């Protein structure tokens, strides 16, 4: 039967991509339906109980700046928070949190259930309704037909999912959940380019059977306690817990090597490629044979469970080998395994067949987000979900889409990498992937993106008011530092030596003083004159977030300005569109190889064309000349 209500957007899947997609579409004003095989698993953390990390934390902050759910849910569920790379520059500092799985899932579900314009419905999707080259809806396993202007598919690892433990395997979307085989078969019929990838998870341990006395404790940051959301507060966090560290050893490695003949990875049973930056323990032992040991982080899964996630020993080895390797680890000699580790192999679709909006090129109105695009990680999935959901809503409403640029957001880097370069292994975000990372910091994600989110309808009044106050306060304080001057009479020698290491001999602005390497904003605001009065303070010192933002903007102003100059030069051609119907065979000045690559990839802009492997700068120059001729010819014809 046809469901009586029609929708603007249907989102298929309730993982990290699907939930952000549904929330974004609904916030943008679209009548949105989220279809999931099980409402109880909305927002489920299928693998590790953590959010964030290098590059990943930047994505979470960007999702938050655009009104998304992940960061605030992490603040409500996080049981340990840390700033990684805290001793390095602000561009590569990243927030990471351990999360209570149940609290996180509950926080996401609460946001979904309280979001206007959003309906939830529990049914697995078996088919897509396609008329010509336009998607018009989805069909569930009991034959219900839901109609919509656009569909966002976020199927995760469920498409023809195959779970491996040793040489045994069975169909599944993840442990305990059925696969989406019918939907996977339907997508094959649509002849979208696809492949197989693999990921894995470690066995879970009963924490009561661990000897913590021989382990290294890893507490979270306490002064100050980090928060993820720009609207978050440390007071939102539940009780905090430590993690623990152990190490593999020669005995562990011997056990693993002895079981490789029964490993599905090394016996050829698994065809899919696994994630390079989150390898299985058997892959680590094989690839880094000269390494004597590897760290294993024992991470709590929640406040009301004894279950421990041993991060670093993801495996698909047979259970008897898993049993031995776990018991070879210091502190885990008597550990009780609650769940075996496994690998899962699944279908993904070549993201080069997507537009930069994450809409498929072949089928209008059909958007893909998350692991279906060849990525790995909750954060990468959430970011894609938000973008796909927003663009699906905009398209359904007849509005222009939004495509973030590489200089605007890590989300822009992520999408551009996917649609221009594709993937040969699960894609993970790193700060090193962003050429403009000094401008793409965690701390300024809201200053970069919240105004855009407001324009798209993604940002509510509460977030907008908080952002506006922060933006204005930072701008006013930066301007005050530039326009306030001090001289040797105002800043006496002893005070200057304490602050700067030497007396000043001429007049300086406060901004100039703050740019010096050893001067902090806090020290500058606390400096006093001979009369005991504050030289320049207190400024915004009472608000640590504002103080850090002001210090970063002032100290790195020169570097950021130079980077922005680079961006402006680059943008002159970066955004130049390439006609969708361009005949590359007519560009005879290009080599046959380059023409073939451009015909295969069909880049949307000159910037994308330049990033296609094998397309040289000389080829781009020739393509630009051809586009000028086309433009001149069309103008002449019109005249």
UniProtKB/Swiss-Prot annotation:
Pfam families according to UniProt: GIDA, GIDA_C_1st, SAM_GIDA_C
UniProtKB keywords: Cytoplasm, FAD, Flavoprotein, NAD, tRNA processing
Disulfide bond positions: none
Localization (cell): Cytoplasm
Annotated NAD(+) binding sites: 274-288
Required cofactor names: FAD
Binding site for FAD: 13-18
GO molecular function: flavin adenine dinucleotide binding
GO terms, biological process: tRNA methylation; tRNA wobble uridine modification
InterPro entries in the cross-refs: FAD/NAD-bd_sf, GIDA_C_N, MnmG, MnmG-rel, MnmG-rel_CS, MnmG_C, MnmG_C_subdom, MnmG_C_subdom_sf
GO cellular component, one term: cytosol
PROSITE patterns reported in the protein's UniProt record: GIDA_1, GIDA_2
Main localization, broad class: cytoplasm
Subunit structure: Homodimer. Heterotetramer of two MnmE and two MnmG subunits.
Function, as annotated: NAD-binding protein involved in the addition of a carboxymethylaminomethyl (cmnm) group at the wobble position (U34) of certain tRNAs, forming tRNA-cmnm(5)s(2)U34.
Family: Belongs to the MnmG family.
Name of the protein in question: tRNA uridine 5-carboxymethylaminomethyl modification enzyme MnmG
Organism: Bordetella pertussis (strain Tohama I / ATCC BAA-589 / NCTC 13251)
């Amino acid at each position: 039967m046809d469901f009586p209500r029609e929708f603007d957007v249907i989102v298929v899947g309730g993982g990290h991509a699907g939930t952000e997609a549904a929330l974004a579409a609904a916030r943008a004003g679209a009548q949105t339906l989220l279809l999931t095989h099980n409402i109880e698993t909305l927002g489920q953390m299928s693998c590790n109980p953590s959010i964030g990390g290098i590059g990943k934390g930047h994505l979470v902050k960007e999702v938050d700046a655009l009104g998304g759910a992940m960061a605030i849910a992490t603040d409500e569920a996080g049981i340990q928070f840390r700033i990684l790379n805290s001793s390095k520059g602000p561009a590569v500092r990243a927030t990471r949190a351990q999360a209570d799985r149940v609290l996180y899932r509950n926080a996401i579900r609460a946001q979904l259930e309280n979001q206007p314009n959003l309906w939830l419905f529990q049914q697995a999707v078996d088919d897509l309704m396609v008329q010509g080259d336009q998607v018009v809806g989805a069909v569930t396993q009991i034959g219900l037909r839901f109609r919509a202007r656009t569909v966002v598919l976020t199927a995760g690892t469920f498409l023809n999912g195959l779970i491996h433990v040793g040489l045994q395997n069975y169909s599944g979307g993840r442990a305990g959940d059925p696969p989406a085989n019918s939907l996977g078969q339907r997508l094959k019929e649509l002849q979208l380019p696809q492949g197989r990838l693999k990921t894995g998870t470690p066995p879970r341990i009963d924490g009561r059977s661990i000897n913590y006395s021989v382990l290294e404790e890893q507490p979270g940051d306490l002064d100050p306690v980090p928060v993820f959301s720009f609207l978050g507060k440390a007071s939102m966090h539940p009780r905090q817990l430590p993690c623990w560290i152990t190490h593999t050893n020669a005995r562990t490695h011997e056990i693993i090597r002895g079981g490789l003949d029964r490993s599905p990875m090394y016996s050829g049973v698994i065809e899919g490629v696994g994630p390079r930056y989150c390898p299985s323990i058997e892959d680590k032992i094989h690839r880094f044979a000269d390494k004597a040991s590897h760290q294993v982080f024992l991470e709590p899964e929640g406040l009301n469970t004894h279950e421990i996630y041993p991060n670093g020993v993801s495996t698909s080895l047979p259970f008897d080998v898993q049993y031995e390797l776990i018991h070879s680890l210091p502190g885990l000699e008597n550990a009780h395994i609650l769940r075996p580790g496994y690998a899962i192999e699944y279908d993904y679709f070549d993201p080069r067949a997507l537009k930069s909006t994450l809409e498929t090129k072949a089928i209008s109105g059909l958007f893909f987000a998350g692991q279906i695009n060849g990525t790995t990680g909750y954060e990468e999935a959430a970011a894609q979900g938000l973008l796909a959901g927003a663009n699906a809503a905009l398209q359904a409403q007849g509005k222009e889409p939004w495509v973030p640029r590489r200089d605007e957001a890590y989300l822009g880097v992520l999408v551009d990498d996917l649609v221009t370069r594709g993937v040969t292994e699960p894609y993970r975000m790193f700060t090193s992937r962003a050429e403009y990372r000094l401008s793409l910091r965690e701390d300024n994600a809201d200053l970069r993106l919240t105004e855009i989110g407001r324009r798209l309808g993604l940002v509510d009044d509460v977030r907008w008011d908080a952002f506006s106050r922060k933006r204005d306060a930072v701008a006013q304080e930066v301007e005050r530092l530039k326009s306030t001057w001090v001289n040797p009479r105002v800043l006496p020698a002893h005070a200057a030596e304490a602050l700067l290491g030497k007396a000043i001999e001429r007049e300086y602005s406060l901004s100039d003083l703050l740019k010096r390497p050893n001067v902090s904003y806090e020290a500058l605001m606390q400096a006093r004159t001979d009369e005991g009065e504050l030289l320049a303070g207190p400024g915004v010192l009472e608000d640590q977030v504002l103080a850090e933002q002001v210090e970063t903007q002032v100290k790195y102003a020169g570097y950021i300005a130079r980077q922005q100059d680079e961006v402006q030069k680059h943008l002159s051609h970066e955004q130049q569109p390439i006609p969708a119907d361009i005949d590359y065979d007519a560009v005879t000045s290009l080599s046959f190889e380059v023409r073939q690559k451009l015909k295969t990839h069909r880049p949307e802009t000159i910037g994308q064309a330049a990033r296609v492997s094998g397309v040289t700068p000389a080829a781009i120059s020739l393509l630009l000349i051809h586009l000028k001729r086309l433009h001149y010819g069309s103008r002449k014809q019109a005249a």
